[in-house]
């Protein structure tokens, strides 16, 4: 028998039931019992789906109220002291993830949420564990055991999933100086022993223990920690050591020495590792082959996968398991919900529910089931047809791609010359003030957008409504005294989806939601074909806004790499080529904007760093083509057209050369929370172009004082020549309300004016 399973299933519910229940609970509209009932219903449905599809195990422990790393933190009794008030409960978990205001806690100070960061190179976020020297661990949070029991009582064969001890430590951070979190390992392992012992007593036979950091380039001390850890926690349950997102060949020497019972590897992300792993697999281990991609939306080529695995099946027999490459939480829930897709387009996709069916069908085919083998061949036919589809391949796009030259990615003059031209044309003051692009998406804007999409507003009525919001934004900015204005992006629901809806080559969905963190879900567009701009996208809005003011108006574009990173890409061509196609489309938009009289154009690239591959040796190749894509986008700009970009990172050191290579005339960055410390990277590199360090944190409702902003600007001027500084917030203002925005920007503009007077005296 070929054992079939998945590494996890989406926890949000097919129509985001968990999101809505969580938000009702946080607003006080339902109690904990009602919230838990929603969670139970989602789990029961997920398990039933896996069983009905024919999987040998259902996966328990993949459900999380906020984030699975945070769930592990509570399971281990490792709650930060500022959030620990007696025995942990759901509210404890939410305090760690979301923080608590002083009014809610009654303590007069509130408690800050733990940090949140990206889960490897996905668009999912996790709550970062915090470690200090006096930490203890105790198994006090019953969620995992309750859910295992729940699944057992429903008659399922259960395989719990547990984040492994080394990855848990690695993914956290020390909160005291001079302390190494790896020294906590012996204490942590005692807790893991207790967890595995308890699962064994519940009748569990296999535990999926996730150690995704084994796909990274680990320092020797972290590699050595695995052997100690697994010698200690080895007990009465079988352990499936689970890795994903990249190859584990770098750490395979250490892996095969571990006292575990099986290994899961991501064959989808790193297909070349399969043969080596099969040859080196210990004779008593199972191999779980992650061949169904858990991170995409594409139908699997089951016929090709079957052909690849049949020799492995011959070698390993029942020791071969078939699985998803990673948890399916990175995929939308159910393709069956999509009512607006054409039959041809639908045949290209598989969401989480369909991927479960793919795993089960592949397992039956590997057992020699003739009907299943035939079904695999039939299932793969749309993939073959898609390769020659006129919808997918466009000769006009391919011609442009083939004609890309180095000159296409260069401005027509170096920065020093451009800066001179721009100073003459733009006429901006010393320390120019601006914002990053978006203004509040008010309830009125959202209502109008919804009415338009439902056909309750005509296109003409909707356009007029949006123009009213743009005019209001321009009027407010002029009253505030900003130097460079923006139109406010009232027409955009999302900075990526907006461009996906207006570029040929994308497919958007109705219910293609995936979890980002907590209750936040995103609905990435899908790149289905060659990308082309068929008509101008932003020109009408920007030129209308420019017609309302004599001040400079910024055109606002989302950059090619960010659009790529925040969508589901094609897999029949390289990510580099998709980025090039996007860059060419945006290049045309830049040309049209400047021809229409827009002299400043911002090309946002907040995701360039997020797109870095997991292994450092692969970074430069990625950065080279990412930089090229940006420069192709900006390459149509004349010397007098000023190109801005915006990035929000917490770490620039490792990519500062590539940031400089973008050759943007102005870069705006997120720096206020770091007290301008992030500028050190630019100072040490001697960054040559202009910089707008964010002077206040837009994620906080707090209004920054003028003196505080002045102090930040003084610190910035110690690192960057004041003549090259801009004054702006950290990020867009979409999520704030107008009173907050106007109060903060008033102080920001006044701070700039005060320092102009002082420094130019």
From Swiss-Prot:
Name the enzyme group at the top EC level. transferase
GO MF annotations, alphabetized? 5-methyltetrahydropteroyltriglutamate-homocysteine S-methyltransferase activity; zinc ion binding
EC number(s)? 2.1.1.14
Q: Which residues bind Zn(2+)?
A: 646, 648, 670, 731
- Segments passing through the bilayer: none
> Under which pathway is this protein filed?
Amino-acid biosynthesis; L-methionine biosynthesis via de novo pathway; L-methionine from L-homocysteine (MetE route): step 1/1
One Pfam short name:
Meth_synt_1
Residues bound to L-methionine: 436-438, 489, 604
* Entry annotated with the keyword Lipoprotein: no
Residue numbers binding L-homocysteine: 436-438, 489, 604
- Name the catalytic site residues: 699 (proton donor)
On cofactor binding, the record's note says:
Binds 1 zinc ion per subunit.
Q: Does the keyword DNA-binding apply?
A: no
What's the cofactor?
Zn(2+)
Q: Which UniProt keywords apply?
A: Amino-acid biosynthesis, Metal-binding, Methionine biosynthesis, Methyltransferase, Repeat, Transferase, Zinc
InterPro entries xref list = Cbl-indep_Met_Synth_N (IPR013215), Cobalamin-indep_Met_synthase (IPR006276), Met_Synth_C/arc (IPR002629), UROD/MetE-like_sf (IPR038071)
| Sequence positions that bind 5-methyltetrahydropteroyltri-L-glutamate | 16-19, 118, 520-521, 566, 610
In the record, biological process GO terms are: methionine biosynthetic process; methylation
What does this protein do, in the record's words? Catalyzes the transfer of a methyl group from 5-methyltetrahydrofolate to homocysteine resulting in methionine formation.
Q: What does the sequence similarity comment in the record state about its family? A: Belongs to the vitamin-B12 independent methionine synthase family.
Stored NCBIfam families: met_syn_B12ind, PRK05222.1
This protein is called what? 5-methyltetrahydropteroyltriglutamate--homocysteine methyltransferase
Source organism: Vibrio cholerae serotype O1 (strain ATCC 39315 / El Tor Inaba N16961)
């Amino acid at each position: 028998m070929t054992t079939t399973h998945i590494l996890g299933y989406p926890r949000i519910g097919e129509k985001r039931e968990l999101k809505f229940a969580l938000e009702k609970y946080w607003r006080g509209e339902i109690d904990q019992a009602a919230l838990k009932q929603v969670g139970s219903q989602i789990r029961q449905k997920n398990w039933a789906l896996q069983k009905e599809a024919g999987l040998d195990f259902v996966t328990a422990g993949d459900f999380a109220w906020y984030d699975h790393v945070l769930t592990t933190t509570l399971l281990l009794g490792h709650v930060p002291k500022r959030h620990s008030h007696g025995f942990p409960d759901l509210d404890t978990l939410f305090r760690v993830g979301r923080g608590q205001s002083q009014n809610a806690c009654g303590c007069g100070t509130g408690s800050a949420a733990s940090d949140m960061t990206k889960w490897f190179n996905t668009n999912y976020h996790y709550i970062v564990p915090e470690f200090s020297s006096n930490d203890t661990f105790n198994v006090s949070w019953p969620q995992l055991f309750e859910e295992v029991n729940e699944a057992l009582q429903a008659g399922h064969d259960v395989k719990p999933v547990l984040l492994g001890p080394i990855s848990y430590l690695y993914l956290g951070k020390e909160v005291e100086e001079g302390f190494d979190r790896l020294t906590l390992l012996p204490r942590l392992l005692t807790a893991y022993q207790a967890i595995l012992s308890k699962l064994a007593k519940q009748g569990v036979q296999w535990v999926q223990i996730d150690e995704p950091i084994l796909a990274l380039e680990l320092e020797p001390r972290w590699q050595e920690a695995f052997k100690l850890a697994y010698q200690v926690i080895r007990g009465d349950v079988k352990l499936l050591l689970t890795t994903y997102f990249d190859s584990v060949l770098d750490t395979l020497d250490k892996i095969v020495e571990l006292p575990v019972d099986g290994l899961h590897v991501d064959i989808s992300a790193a297909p070349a590792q399969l043969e080596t792993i099969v040859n080196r697999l210990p004779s008593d281990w199972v191999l779980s082959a992650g061949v169904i991609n858990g991170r995409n939306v594409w139908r699997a080529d089951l016929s090709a996968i079957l052909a690849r695995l049949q020799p492995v099946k011959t070698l390993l027999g029942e020791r071969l398991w078939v699985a998803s490459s990673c948890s399916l939480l990175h995929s939308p829930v159910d393709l069956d919900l999509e009512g607006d897709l054409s039959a041809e387009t639908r045949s290209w996709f598989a969401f989480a529910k369909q991927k479960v069916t793919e795993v089960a069908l592949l397992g039956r085919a590997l057992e020699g089931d003739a009907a299943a083998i035939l079904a695999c061949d039939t299932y793969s036919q749309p993939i073959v047809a898609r390769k020659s589809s006129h919808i997918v391949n466009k000769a006009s796009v391919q011609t442009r791609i083939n004609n890309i030259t180095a000159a296409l990615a260069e401005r027509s003059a170096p920065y020093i010359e451009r800066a001179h031209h721009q100073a003459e044309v733009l006429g901006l003051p010393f320390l120019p003030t601006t914002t990053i692009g978006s203004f509040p998406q008010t309830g009125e804007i959202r209502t109008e957008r919804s009415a338009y999409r439902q056909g309750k507003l005509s296109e003409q009525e909707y356009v007029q409504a949006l123009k009213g919001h743009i005019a209001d934004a321009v009027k407010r900015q002029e009253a505030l005294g900003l130097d460079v204005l923006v139109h406010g992006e009232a027409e955009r629901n999302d900075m990526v989806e907006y461009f996906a809806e207006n570029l040929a080559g994308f497919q958007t969905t109705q219910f293609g939601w995936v979890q980002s963190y907590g209750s936040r879900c995103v609905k990435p567009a899908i790149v289905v074909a060659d990308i082309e701009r068929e008509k101008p996208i932003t020109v009408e809005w920007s030129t209308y806004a420019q017609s309302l003011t004599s001040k400079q108006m910024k055109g606002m574009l989302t950059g090619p790499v960010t659009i790529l990173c925040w969508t589901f890409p094609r897999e029949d061509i390289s990510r580099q080529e998709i980025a090039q196609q996007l860059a060419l489309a945006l290049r045309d938009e830049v040309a049209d904007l400047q021809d229409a009289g827009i002299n400043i154009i911002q090309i946002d690239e907040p995701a360039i760093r997020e797109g870095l591959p997991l292994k450092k040796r692969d970074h430069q190749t990625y950065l080279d083509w990412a930089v090229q894509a940006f420069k192709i986008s900006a390459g149509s700009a004349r010397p007098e057209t000023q190109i801005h970009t915006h990035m929000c990172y917490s770490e620039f050191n490792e990519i500062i050369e590539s940031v400089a290579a973008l050759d943007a005339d102005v870069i705006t960055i997120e720096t206020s929370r770091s007290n301008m410390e992030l500028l050190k990277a630019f100072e040490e590199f001697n960054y040559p172009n202009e910089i707008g360090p964010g002077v206040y944190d837009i994620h906080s409702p707090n209004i920054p004082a003028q003196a505080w902003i002045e102090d930040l600007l003084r610190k910035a001027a110690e690192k960057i020549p004041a003549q090259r500084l801009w004054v702006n917030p950290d990020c867009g203002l979409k999520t704030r309300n107008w009173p907050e925005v106007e109060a903060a920007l008033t102080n920001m503009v006044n701070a700039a004016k005060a320092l102009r007077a002082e420094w130019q005296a």
